[in-house]
């Protein structure tokens, strides 16, 4: 009985060593992270940014839909109005220590101003540094939708142009002529 147990023990040890050595020469799955970039899928939800129109103006019209859609309430903003009647956020703040990167704010945004990028390197040593203001979130480009301009598409009156002169807008209909 003792000899059989010794033979079984030696057999299991040899089998374990065989597995270890067979994996020793296989290709590695581990990456040296800072030196080699990590692949992230195209729809990966990472850092949140605020984008600009093709004209260079910020896209956000401070409609507050992103803050309402956020399940953890990490977005806060205050609406203000420019001289030409266009709305903009006086301040726009995201607390990334609370954000769960669900993407509901991006889906709720009618102007595609708020977008999630594949960037995930947002580590900070202090919690206060994870609260990003509008200046930190605003990027110089249009993001995922380079040709979209909310004010041209929406049909809102633009200074110097009457209603119906925007790119994708039909001329106004005279409603009184439709009455019986």
Curated annotation (Swiss-Prot):
InterPro entries: 4Fe4S_Fe-S-bd, 4Fe4S_Fe_S_CS, NADH_quinone_OxRdtase_chainI
Subcellular location: Cell inner membrane
Listed GO MF terms: 4 iron, 4 sulfur cluster binding; iron ion binding; NADH:ubiquinone reductase (non-electrogenic) activity; quinone binding
Catalytic reaction list: a quinone + NADH + 5 H(+)(in) = a quinol + NAD(+) + 4 H(+)(out)
Cofactor annotation remark: Binds 2 [4Fe-4S] clusters per subunit.
Binding sites annotated in the UniProt record for [4Fe-4S] cluster 2: 70, 99, 102, 105
Residues engaged in binding [4Fe-4S] cluster 1: 60, 63, 66, 109
EC numbers on record: 7.1.1.-
GO cellular component, one term: plasma membrane
The entry's keywords: 4Fe-4S, Cell inner membrane, Cell membrane, Iron, Iron-sulfur, Membrane, Metal-binding, NAD, Quinone, Repeat, Translocase, Ubiquinone
Region: Disordered, residue numbers: 161-180
BP terms from Gene Ontology: aerobic respiration
Domain 4Fe-4S ferredoxin-type: 48-80, 90-119
Main location: membrane
Topology in membrane: Peripheral membrane protein
Basic and acidic residues compositional bias, start-end: 161-174
Matches recorded under Pfam families: Fer4_7 (PF12838)
PROSITE patterns: 4FE4S_FER_1, 4FE4S_FER_2
Cofactor(s) the protein needs: [4Fe-4S] cluster
Oligomeric and partner information: NDH-1 is composed of 14 different subunits. Subunits NuoA, H, J, K, L, M, N constitute the membrane sector of the complex.
Family: Belongs to the complex I 23 kDa subunit family.
Name of protein: NADH-quinone oxidoreductase subunit I
The species this protein was found in: Aeromonas salmonicida (strain A449)
Taxonomic path: Bacteria, Pseudomonadati, Pseudomonadota, Gammaproteobacteria, Aeromonadales
């Amino acid at each position: 009985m003792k000899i059989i147990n010794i033979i079984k023990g030696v057999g299991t040890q040899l089998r374990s060593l065989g597995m270890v050595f067979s994996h020793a020469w296989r290709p590695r799955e581990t990456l040296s992270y800072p030196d080699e970039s990590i692949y992230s899928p195209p729809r990966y939800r990472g850092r949140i940014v605020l984008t600009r129109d093709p004209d260079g103006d910020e896209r956000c019209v401070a409609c507050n839909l992103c803050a309402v859609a956020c399940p953890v309430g990490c977005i806060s903003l205050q609406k203000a109005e420019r001289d030409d009647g266009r709305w903009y956020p006086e301040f726009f703040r995201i607390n990334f220590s609370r954000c769960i990167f669900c993407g509901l704010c991006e889906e709720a945004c009618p102007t595609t101003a708020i977008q999630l990028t594949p960037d995930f390197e947002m580590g900070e040593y202090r919690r206060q540094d994870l609260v990003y203001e509008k200046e930190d979130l605003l990027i110089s480009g249009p993001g995922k939708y380079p040709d979209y301009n909310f004010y041209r598409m929406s049909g809102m009156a633009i200074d110097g142009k009457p209603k119906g002169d925007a790119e994708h807008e039909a001329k106004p209909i005279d409603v009184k002529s439709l009455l019986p």
